[in-house]
């Protein structure tokens, strides 16, 4: 019996009795003091949430007040909010293509901040001012690398509001391993330099939202802690609630000091690739009912398939998202949706050269610091775009290709003080090799690789 006792371990965490302070025995099972503490925390948290004790939340807010700041910036006014056409023009400078999505987002963002300014005007109570304006969160649907995150980030830059990005795949229900949804608000608060007022007017972008779709359309009788459970946990935050945010992050504890954040003024933008969603739409409409693109015996090209997918998704209805795995309550809190198109070779070429922070401009600037003038042949730009399109990761592939291409050049050119000019050719791109450096003006012409 003594030999058996020496190998007792917790039935929940697996730690032996030598690794814990106490090991409590039951009929055939054992539990350690650490697991008991964890269970108590989960039960206490559920108890506080169910009671909805506002008094305790207010006390927590007062205790945490030193960690938060008072806003030094005034609330937006109607006159200070850029008009939808101005917003879209600013987006055009940074984001190539996606005209329909930019128009949808410009109107939605304008209405959102107009709503905040309307509520903060402090006008007398009239029938018009008594009308409550509800916010409209945005759902972006599009393939990877098409500009979903960049759109949201550019909007925040223009409006000069805090902006935070969260990954939905890291979130879990309270009480399980992973991040609580309140940690999203903590990121926004940190971006606002712990200024609660500023954070409450910010923008949160939740990426990979399609990855928390439940496994089937029917409600599950088992726990889906990283799918439907996360959707349920996000509902109140998306709609607007006063959330208790632990200032140090991590799991909430019923007795710890928290910062209160009102999410009713925060604009939530959710994005995802939603792979296979077009098939759900086609199934509803009938596969043969949509004849956007002609077919031949050899089948459709990739460009035609991408165009057809975009055309199909323009007929998207909320019920299609339910069938995909989003719960109806979640969809109802994302009333504005926009479908982004896959980037074709022409769009990728434009991304390389046109935006304010285009890759070509970035590398020209880097080499100009070494007194080298960098040029790209039009054929080289086209070859880079072709390779990026082949990799199927959208605009994200462009930087990887250019970094590979420029590695040797960025290594050698700073040490060659006689080189003042260099041209990237199509052959260099296709072979991923560096060419001969350009001689100084007046000497023999460059020989292309």
From Swiss-Prot:
Ligand binding (ATP): 143-150
Keywords tagged on the record: ATP-binding, Chaperone, Metal-binding, Nucleotide-binding, Zinc
Self-association state and partner proteins as the record states: Component of the ClpX-ClpP complex. Forms a hexameric ring that, in the presence of ATP, binds to fourteen ClpP subunits assembled into a disk-like structure with a central cavity, resembling the structure of eukaryotic proteasomes.
Function in brief: ATP-dependent specificity component of the Clp protease. It directs the protease to specific substrates. Can perform chaperone functions in the absence of ClpP.
Family, as annotated: Belongs to the ClpX chaperone family.
HAMAP family tied to this protein: ClpX
The protein, known as: ATP-dependent Clp protease ATP-binding subunit ClpX
Source species: Parasynechococcus marenigrum (strain WH8102)
Organismal lineage: Bacteria, Bacillati, Cyanobacteriota, Cyanophyceae, Synechococcales
């Amino acid at each position: 019996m003594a030999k058996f006792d020496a190998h007792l371990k917790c039935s929940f965490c697996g730690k032996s009795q030598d690794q814990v302070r106490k090991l409590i025995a039951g009929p055939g099972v054992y539990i350690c003091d650490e697991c008991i503490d964890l269970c108590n925390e989960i039960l206490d948290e559920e108890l506080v949430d169910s009671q909805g004790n506002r008094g305790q939340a207010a006390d927590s807010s007062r205790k945490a007040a030193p960690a938060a700041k008072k806003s030094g910036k005034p609330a937006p006014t109607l006159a200070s909010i850029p008009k939808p056409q101005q917003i879209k023009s600013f987006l055009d400078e940074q984001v190539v293509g996606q005209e329909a999505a930019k128009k949808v987002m410009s109107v939605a963002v304008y209405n959102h901040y107009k709503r905040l300014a309307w509520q903060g005007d402090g006008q007398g109570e009239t029938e018009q001012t008594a009308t409550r304006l509800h916010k409209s969160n945005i759902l972006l649907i599009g393939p990877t690398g098409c500009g979903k995150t960049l759109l949201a980030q550019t909007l925040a830059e223009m409006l000069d509001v805090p902006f935070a990005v969260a990954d939905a795949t890291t979130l879990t229900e309270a009480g399980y391993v992973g991040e609580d949804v309140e940690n999203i608000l903590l990121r926004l608060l940190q971006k606002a330099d712990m200024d609660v007022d500023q954070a409450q007017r910010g923008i949160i972008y939740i990426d990979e939202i399609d990855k928390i779709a439940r496994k089937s359309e029917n409600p599950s009788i088992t726990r889906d802690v990283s799918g439907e459970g996360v959707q349920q946990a996000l509902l109140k935050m998306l709609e607007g609630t006063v959330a208790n945010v632990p200032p140090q992050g991590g799991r909430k504890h019923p007795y710890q000091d928290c910062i209160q954040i009102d999410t009713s003024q925060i604009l939530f933008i959710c994005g995802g690739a939603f792979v296979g969603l077009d098939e759900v739409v086609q199934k509803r409409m009938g596969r043969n009912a949509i004849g956007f693109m002609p077919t031949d015996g050899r089948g459709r090209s990739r460009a035609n398939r991408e165009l057809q997918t975009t055309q199909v998704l323009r007929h998207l209805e909320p019920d299609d998202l339910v069938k995909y795995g989003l719960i109806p309550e979640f969809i109802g809190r994302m009333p504005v949706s926009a479908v982004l198109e896959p980037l074709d070779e022409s769009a990728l070429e434009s991304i390389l050269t046109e935006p304010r922070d285009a890759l070509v401009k970035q590398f020209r600037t880097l080499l100009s610091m070494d007194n080298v003038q960098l040029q790209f042949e039009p054929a080289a730009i086209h070859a880079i775009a072709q390779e990026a399109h082949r990799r199927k990761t959208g605009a994200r592939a462009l930087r990887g290709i250019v970094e590979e291409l420029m590695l040797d050049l960025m290594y050698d050119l700073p040490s060659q003080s006689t080189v003042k000019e260099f041209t990237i050719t199509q052959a260099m791109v296709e072979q991923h090799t560096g060419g001969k450096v350009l001689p100084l003006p007046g000497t023999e012409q460059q020989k292309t690789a």
